């Protein structure tokens, strides 16, 4: 310590502080350089930024025993500056110790990994993670599985036969009903206890079924093509269609019952159309074809024939023999005079009807055209039921409700039907079951089928019977006759105007075409006259030939302008 204190210049003297500081820095640098030369094992020089005094640096170079302190200082500074020292004996020893520590850490980690494989909870505990202790399930006592021995039945008994059938096929059917199958003999015996009732036998195929519901389903699914017959072996079409409708509702489709045909249908009309022609030869199909009695063209359906009749031969009219009794009174043929109406007259009536509908829509736009053409029920092909009558006050109230709330509710108690128009509410009240009014149904006069709505019966007559739902009335009213006379006058005037315009256009086209032949004929006539004059006698007067030469120039001038 004395040597260190003696080396330090304690007395400042007259020199300034800057000079003292510079001398200290220079002395420290020299001492560090000497230390690095003396000890080759330590080659690191402390940078000049450190705040060591000159005395400490000078004393570090005197003995070797004091060098350990400087070495410790240098390693400390090296660690602070993150600089790796050179390889020395001491450093090598420290490196070996560190390697041993790393190996120990690796061994510990391996042991932890092995423990984690066996018990994964251990690793979480080592790393300080909290984990709830899981309740270990109680180990179940491992009982020996005893293989059941096959049951033994008496030789030749029914149980033995059933058991052999189960082993062979997987199930055995009930010997009573032959419809139910079981996989065990116990289950079969339990079924046979309840299977002692009388069986339901299908009268179509002879199959026996256990329940009435099963029999109904069997008939509906497999025998839906068999028609329902009346007393005289006639097909009852309304009940037959109703039965097919229920089959279609439950099964979702109608299946053709021919073995060679696998067609299915989702509509009754398509099914009936297919059944009528399925499995029949071409000759039989030709007999079933409907032929037009005007031109003899064959059609497969009534709808196709009706469309052909309307488009090619005017409206559809059936002869007197095929007309039903309920429509004979409304026949279109004249009864009093005994004269049969011709086809051209029928077509004229049809066209008059179209003209009348067009004129009525122009003259009375708010009035229904069909109501004017078919005013009374005697000319309809269906009957209308009685509809309820409403007072003007009720109708006015309903109209105001529609303007305010845009809807009307049915006035009957318990009915929640809502409509957006008065006509819809009227139609609903005619068929509402919660009210006091009991209304009938719309009935088709051609097949006596009933419908709930008028649009339904109209569609039925047009599609099924391929006819109009009303009969055209050949006798017209006075207003209708006036309208037709006015229409005929307008048509005649239009025709006259067209003819007059055509004549004028033809005259205009013929005038420029006729002028050149006249001009060509005149000089020829002059030449002939000149020749004749020469023959007859000398009369040289070429006066008419000169003005004719000027005319072709005019024609050429006109052509140039064109």
Curated annotation (Swiss-Prot):
Cite the residue spans of the region called Disordered: 1-32, 86-150, 489-562
InterPro entries according to UniProt: Krueppel_C2H2_Zn-finger (IPR052274), ZNF512_C2HC (IPR048408), ZNF512_znf-C2H2 (IPR048403), Znf_C2H2_sf (IPR036236), Znf_C2H2_type (IPR013087)
Organism the protein comes from: Mus musculus (Mouse)
C2H2-type ZnF = 200-223, 290-313, 442-465
Gene name of this polypeptide: Znf512
- Note the position of the cross-link Glycyl lysine isopeptide (Lys-Gly) (interchain with G-Cter in SUMO2): 18, 84, 230, 335
Similarity comment: family membership: Belongs to the krueppel C2H2-type zinc-finger protein family.
Q: Which PANTHER family match?
A: ZINC FINGER PROTEIN 512, ZINC FINGER PROTEIN-RELATED
Function text:
May be involved in transcriptional regulation.
Location (main, coarse): nucleus
Instruction: Cite the entry's keywords alphabetically.
Output: DNA-binding, Isopeptide bond, Metal-binding, Nucleus, Repeat, Transcription, Transcription regulation, Ubl conjugation, Zinc, Zinc-finger
* Keyword field contains Membrane: no
Specify residue ranges for compositional bias: Polar residues. Answer: 12-23
Q: Give the UniProt entry's GO cellular component terms.
A: nucleus
Q: Where is the composition biased (Basic residues)?
A: 122-147, 498-507
Specify the protein name. Zinc finger protein 512
**Which Pfam families does the UniProt entry name for this protein?**
zf-C2H2, ZNF512_C2HC, ZNF512_zf-C2H2
Q: Gene3D superfamilies from the xrefs? A: Classic Zinc Finger
Coiled-coil-forming residues are none
User: Where in the cell does this protein reside?
Assistant: Nucleus
Q: Which GO terms describe its molecular function?
A: DNA binding; zinc ion binding
